[in-house]
Amino acid sequence: MNRRSIALLGSLLLAPVARATPDAAESRETRATMGEIFRAVAELLPPSLDAKRFADPAHHDAILAALTKLSTGGAKLEAHGRERDAGFGFLSRSLARDTEEIRRRYAEGQTEEARFLFHEVTQDCVACHSRLPSPRDASLGRRLMLEEQVAALPLDERARLEIATRQFERAETTFEALLASPEYRASDLDLDGALDEYLEVCLRVRRDFERPARALERFAARADVSPRLRARVQHWILSLREIAARKRAATPLAEAQELLAVAQDRTRFPDERDALVYDLAASGELHRFADATPAGPEAALAYFRLGEIESRVGRSFWLSQTEAYFETAIRMAPGEPFAPQALARLQEFLVSGYTGSGGRQVPADVQTRLAELRGLVERARPAAPPPPTPARQVQPPAAR
């Protein structure tokens, strides 16, 4: 089974929305939509775990009907996301696009492609649920975790399922078992992102610094940890304890700026990956600030900083939020000093995604969007003052 089990997707949508919106009715509608999506996924889960059953014509009509419900629910969630913070909006748009793509491919007979995409779309879920603190775990998720099929998942898949179902304390415990397991090589855990995901849960969601420091000390003591990885983990352990001991700034945005100043200090962190803990801690503060501040120059600055961080720490080939953060910063405040920087970073990010074309193969719709954003920034730029009028020179009278 794919490392991102389909069960992740089904459970993601059990969770309440990350922040209560001002309109309680809208919040209820969002939860109802998530329930619709979950029920569709519950129908799809059993056949999706068996490639032959998923492709069996005897099950075609039932699977297509469930995929249609899933796609419809994704479209509804996208509509709700327009009224939410930019991060939720981006992820709900991504979910809507992906679920419709799955339905279309299955309807066209591309059953294995649809099944693969169904597995991969879980990144929408994990990305959304690991942004903000959670006051409690979700009861529906707890019940799902008791399923025999779920309990038998490998540790890495189970940990990601627990994130998607908002079982964050369980996810911490499962990740710690994963980091200690001799069945997984230390280098693979690093390359596969398990260390990063564990720290995301601890810092962004649980806001816990000492527990991961102890877990990383145990991981660093493993015999198969390379000297370079051990040195990196030691950087992370020191950073965790420094942040836990420091005096917080007055606001989340100010706190994030201070943490980022350390993360970007290349005299201390010549390799930017060594600064992961400071980056993740700063991103947690920025998410909290953006969640509470839906608009304005400071919110735009928060999204610009999130784009910078995501460009350094993002791992997903399937779902990169870098583009969404930079674009949100530009649209929200095109006249701010950081907007041209956001535009330059966005252009670099998008063009590099289409190499080795050297940018010549950037799709027309992407070029159109970049041109629109460039126009926003240029129109918002203060007009240059006119050059001073030269003083009129008085000619001396002609000599007689």
Walk through the language-model features, giving the residues of each.
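Alpha-helical segments in soluble extracytoplasmic regions
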Residues: 37-40, 44-81, 175, 274-285
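Extended surface/linker regions that mediate inter-domain or inter-protein docking
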Residues: 61-107, 112-119
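Short hydrophobic/aromatic-rich motifs at helix boundaries and adjacent loops
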Residues: 5, 70-75, 96, 297-300, ...
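Bacterial N-terminal signal peptides that target proteins for export
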Residues: 1-7
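Bacterial N-terminal signal peptides
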Residues: 7-15
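Boundary at the C-terminal end of the N-terminal hydrophobic targeting segment
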Residues: 18-27
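Acidic, polar-rich low-complexity tracts and alpha-helical solenoid repeat scaffolds
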Residues: 26-33, 47, 87-91, 98, ...
